[in-house]
């Protein structure tokens, strides 16, 4: 057994006090009786009625019958409540000479724990006859012995007790002797042969008599022994013991061959008649096996180990015989002194190896302790370690119940090894330890817990259907089916979110899949809740939030808002030949449906009728003159402007412009705007859109005024000059202008028709109108703006 460390003294004292207190409780036991040798299965009692219990309560409360010696001689029929004999009982085997013969038992019930004490009295029947240890007894008597002299004879043994035991002795009829039956202090009956008349060896040297031992049964049983009496010549004095009886105490752990006591007998005769030898007289087998006596010295020696718990004292009859055959009798009373040589015993009557974790006051084990020593050596204390959630509860007659002190938590500890220590109070102290293992069975008291309270997943748009986009994970601290987690999608809080068509979840492992291709331009982000449920009863669950962010892909090419590229009559921009370098011809307005850097647009003059005459502002799409115009320059010019985004790979679109150089216009100088600071490129998309629309508005308004003036004042030239036809057309409503900042000095007018649902709009553009009454200032010095060339892209 493994030994524990120091036992907490407070718990020891408490357990001992409770034990002593309960040992004083006198609960009246229920008593029954049965004759020995009654057949097994015989009815003893009806416990349900005797204990005042309801029908079926013995079965529902798991009633059991426990006995002190751990031998199951009784059995309980829980259904009928009958107490039955499990086996045939032999009173002599169970109790020997002890009377009355009582078997103690306990009836144990659970829920709640309850004990009832019981006693079964085994009544003796006359099933044994008296038996003498020998078949013949030789008795030597001097012929001069006087009438009335007593001669001890062999005693008979009868295993029965009471009236069925040995009652008297008789001897066969004769004229010289009769039998006197004497009662000994131990309760035994001794036969003494009493001489009735003088003897004469010469007349009758020998007698052969039959000694009969009778018990008190009905009918009586008997045993016989032959008594042979030899009449001897005179030996005047028989040996006499100096002390009788002798009394001695011997420790039960005395070694073998230890001297117990030396007896002494004296014979006042001389010669051979005065020589004394010693021996055991009518000794039982137990005494012969335990002790021996030296024939010469009279010293009694120990031949076998003593055991106080089995035999507490011995009465040894001794005999001293002289050379003439006369003998004297003596008695040695040997008291066995108890020593603490028996460790306490722990007998488990009931053990529950598995208990639920949420059940306080659950009985784990019922056990009994005992110590076969006596006095202080037999007093015991019982304890368990202090750091365990269990307590010991004494009940009765050294019975204990081990119960849970509070609800257990399997997730903290799934198994307990409990060491029960029983220590006696002897010197030195002896102890016994026994370990029991208790498994804590799981109860579904823990809900699944997600590794994160929220998850953020990133999915690039235009994904393939059934794409694995991420996983959620939850664990359950329980075990078995209580820890098996099932995942599910919970109903979205937004009733308009088609969650069932967007994502799915694997119920077993929490993997999330996109059910269809996602479009960033239609849905940038959405969120939903996932649930994790265990398979306990009842099931417990938890939930987590999942956010899905759709990443933009460069799947939209730039779209040119102005000028429209719809295949109808081209739009012609009018430029006076007197225009100075940096003169704003028009502005290409484009948007990109993507976001971020995928929507950053840049402009480039791809083709031109006359390279070097016009340039395009790279960030805002403004088309300006690059130098002074001359009469040699062609009147009509065709420009192709490339609009490209910043995606990977980049996407692009082209815008075709028609420019007509005209005479007679004034030369309004449009100063080239300062280069936008580097940080303006990082302005938000909303700012770009507002600036672009404002610029277009100004340009269109100015074009309308100029166009009306030209039509009214120079109607004759209208046919040769041409007109800008800008038919109405649909535009996606979600497009935005992310071009660079900048405004037009001319006035433009535009009309935008947008609907939130259709996603389309109508744009109407009008040409800017310049008054033709302005006179060109030919004498004004034209100075080139150095910033202009650095900001334009020339073809």
Curated annotation (Swiss-Prot):
Domain of life where this protein originates: Eukaryota
Residues in compartment: Cytoplasmic: 711-795
Keyword terms, alphabetized: Calcium, Cell adhesion, Cell membrane, Glycoprotein, Membrane, Repeat, Signal, Transmembrane, Transmembrane helix
GO biological process: cell adhesion; homophilic cell adhesion via plasma membrane adhesion molecules; nervous system development
Localisation: Cell membrane
Positions annotated with a glycan in the UniProt record: 183, 417, 566
Protein name: Protocadherin beta-4
Species in which this protein is naturally found: Pan troglodytes (Chimpanzee)
Top-level taxonomy: Eukaryota, Metazoa, Chordata, Craniata, Vertebrata
Gene responsible for this protein: PCDHB4
């Amino acid at each position: 057994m493994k030994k524990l460390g120091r036992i907490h003294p407070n718990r020891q004292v408490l357990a001992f006090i409770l034990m002593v207190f309960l040992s004083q409780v006198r609960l009246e036991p229920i008593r029954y009786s049965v004759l020995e040798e009654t057949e097994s299965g015989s009815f003893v009692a009806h416990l349900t009625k005797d204990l005042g219990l309801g029908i079926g309560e013995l079965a529902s409360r798991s009633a059991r019958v426990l006995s002190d010696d751990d031998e199951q001689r009784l059995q309980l029929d829980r259904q009928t409540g009958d107490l039955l004999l499990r086996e045939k009982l032999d009173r002599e085997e169970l109790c020997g000479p002890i009377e009355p013969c009582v078997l103690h038992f306990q009836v144990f019930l659970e829920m709640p724990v309850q004990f009832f004490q019981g006693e079964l009295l085994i009544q003796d029947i006359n099933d044994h006859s008296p038996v003498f240890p020998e078949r013949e007894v030789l008795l030597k008597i001097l012929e001069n012995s006087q009438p009335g002299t007593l001669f001890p004879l062999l005693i008979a043994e009868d295993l029965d007790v009471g009236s069925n035991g040995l009652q008297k002795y008789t001897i066969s009829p004769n004229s010289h002797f009769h039998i006197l039956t004497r009662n000994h202090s131990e309760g035994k009956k001794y036969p003494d042969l009493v001489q009735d008349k003088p003897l004469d060896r010469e007349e009758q040297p020998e007698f052969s008599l039959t000694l009969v031992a009778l018990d008190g049964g009905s009918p009586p049983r008997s045993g016989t022994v032959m008594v042979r009496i030899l009449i001897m010549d005179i030996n005047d004095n028989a040996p006499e013991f100096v002390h009788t009886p002798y009394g001695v105490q011997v420790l039960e752990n005395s070694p073998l061959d230890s001297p117990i006591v030396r007896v002494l007998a004296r014979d006042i005769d001389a010669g051979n008649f005065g020589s004394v030898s010693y021996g055991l007289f009518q000794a039982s087998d137990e005494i012969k096996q335990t002790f021996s006596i030296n024939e010469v010295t009279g010293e009694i020696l120990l031949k076998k180990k003593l055991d106080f718990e089995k035999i507490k004292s011995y009465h040894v009859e001794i005999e001293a015989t002289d050379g003439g055959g006369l003998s004297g009798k003596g008695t040695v009373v040997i008291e066995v002194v108890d020593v603490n040589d028996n460790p306490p015993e722990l007998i488990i009557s009931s053990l529950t190896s598995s208990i639920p974790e949420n059940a306080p006051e659950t009985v784990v084990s019922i056990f009994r302790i005992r110590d076969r020593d006596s006095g202080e050596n037999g007093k015991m204390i019982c304890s368990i370690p202090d750091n365990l959630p269990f307590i010991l509860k004494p009940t009765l007659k050294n019975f204990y119940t081990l119960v849970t002190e509070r609800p257990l938590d399997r997730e903290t500890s799934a198994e307990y090894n409990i060491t029960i220590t029983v220590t006696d109070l002897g010197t030195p102290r002896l102890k016994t330890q026994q370990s029991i293992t208790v498994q804590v069975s799981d109860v579904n008291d823990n809900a699944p817990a997600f590794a994160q309270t929220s998850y953020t997943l990133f999915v690039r748009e235009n994904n393939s259907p059934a794409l694995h986009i991420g996983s959620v994970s939850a664990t359950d601290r329980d075990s078995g089916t209580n820890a098996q987690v099932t995942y599910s999608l919970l109903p979205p809080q937004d009733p308009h979110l088609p969650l069932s068509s967007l994502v799915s979840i694997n119920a077993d492992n929490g993997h999330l899949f996109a059910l269809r291709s996602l479009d960033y331009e239609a849905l940038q982000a959405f969120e939903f809740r996932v649930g994790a449920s265990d398979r306990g009863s009842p099931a417990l669950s938890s939930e987590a939030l999942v956010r899905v962010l759709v990443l933009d892909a460069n799947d939209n090419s730039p779209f040119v808002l102005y000028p429209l590229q719809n295949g109808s009559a081209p739009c012609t921009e009018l430029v006076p030949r007197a225009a100075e370098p940096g003169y704003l011809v028009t502005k290409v307005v484009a948007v990109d449906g993507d976001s971020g850097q995928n929507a950053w647009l840049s402009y480039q003059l791809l083709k031109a009728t006359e390279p070097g005459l016009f340039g395009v502002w790279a960030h805002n799409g403004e088309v300006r003159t690059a130098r002074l115009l001359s009469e040699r320059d062609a009147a009509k010019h065709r420009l192709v402007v490339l609009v490209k985004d910043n995606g990977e790979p980049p996407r692009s679109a082209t815008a075709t412009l028609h420019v007509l150089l005209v005479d007679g216009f004034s030369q309004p100088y449009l100063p080239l705007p300062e280069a936008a600071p580097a940080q303006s490129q990082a302005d938000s998309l909303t700012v770009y859109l507002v600036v672009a629309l404002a610029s277009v508005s100004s340009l269109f308004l100015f074009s309308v005024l100029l166009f009306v003036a030209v039509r009214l004042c120079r109607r004759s030239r209208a046919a040769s000059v041409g007109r800008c036809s800008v038919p109405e057309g649909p535009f996606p409503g979600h497009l935005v202008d992310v071009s660079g900042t900048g405004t037009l000095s001319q006035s433009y007018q535009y009309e935008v028709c947008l609907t939130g649902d259709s996603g389309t709009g109508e744009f109407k553009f009008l040409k800017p109108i310049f008054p033709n009454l302005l006179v060109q200032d030919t004498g004004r010095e034209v100075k080139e703006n150095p910033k202009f060339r650095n900001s334009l892209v020339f073809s």
